[in-house]
């Protein structure tokens, strides 16, 4: 858990957690992890939605983060087939809200979750960050590729250093 690691190794760092606590993943697991984090005096949890622009702006206005790590998104390739609205709201509108907040309340760096899904139907293995990613095979992948393009544009237009992490699904 990234937040726990930061709280344990950087005791003077304030960590703000935002989660809508939806039930795509088991809420009891989220609540158990949240209970561990709330033991730290320098941890603040806010239950809310990335797509709530007013909330995002108020968080940035109140806390003025130096570094933003956005791991929030609606996950799951298959779920995107039957629930496209959830992906547009969280992965596009929510990410746009984060980018806009980073623009209006300048940050040192934005780190965000992308996905290996951006490689789409690429048959070449191993994958490389130099591979073309212009052939998504799901709405989820398209939203993650869009995030990368949006972050790149904001980085160039508004000088927001950003790093996208293309996570792979873990089996086991």
Where in the sequence are the language-model features?
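N-terminal Rossmann-like NAD(P)+-binding domain of SDR-like oxidoreductases, especially those catalyzing
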Residues: 1-170
């Amino acid at each position: 858990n990234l937040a726990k690691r930061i709280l344990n190794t950087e005791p003077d760092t304030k960590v703000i957690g935002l989660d809508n606590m939806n039930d795509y993943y088991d809420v009891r697991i989220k609540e158990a992890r949240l209970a561990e984090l709330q033991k730290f005096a320098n941890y603040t949890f806010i239950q809310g939605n990335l797509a709530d622009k007013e909330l995002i702006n108020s968080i940035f206005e109140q806390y003025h983060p130096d570094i933003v790590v956005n791991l929030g998104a609606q996950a799951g390739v298959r779920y995107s087939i039957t629930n496209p609205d959830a992906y547009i709201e969280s992965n596009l509108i929510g990410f746009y809200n984060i980018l806009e907040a980073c623009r209006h309340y300048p940050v040192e760096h934005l780190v965000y979750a992308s996905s290996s899904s951006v490689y789409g139907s690429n048959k070449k293995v191993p994958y490389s960050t130099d591979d073309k990613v212009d052939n998504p095979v799901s709405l989820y992948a398209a939203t993650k590729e869009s995030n990368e393009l949006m972050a790149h544009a904001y980085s160039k237009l508004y000088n927001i250093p950003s790093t996208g992490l293309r996570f792979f699904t873990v089996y086991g």
